[in-house]
Amino acid sequence: MAATRSILTLSSIRSKAVIYTFLLMDKPDGGALRQRVRPEHKAYLARVAERMAFAGPLVSDDGHTMLGSLLAIDFESRDAAQTWLANEPFTVAGLYASSSVHAFVNLWPQKAGFAPAD
């Protein structure tokens, strides 16, 4: 009997919420703005904490200079993810020079965060 191979696609997991990744790069010299808006940003993130796989700043090789943010959050749709980003305090304050949002399928076992998709 020939083995059948299952191919995982975004449409095959649509019945579930999807993890969306946010790659958000700061404008040059955005450090002061980032620090000023950070309390609002953290409060906004706390509202989706139960759906968050991970979140944190992107830093330069010195380990301290913040360059942007990388987040992975579970949303029901791309529209919901985009709306969430549009209202995110760093976005509203104009911190980001660029942003991209992508659906993410976790296929690698991990010890924390979201379980891999089947």
Residue map of PLM features:
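Conserved, structured core segments of small domains
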Residues: 2-118
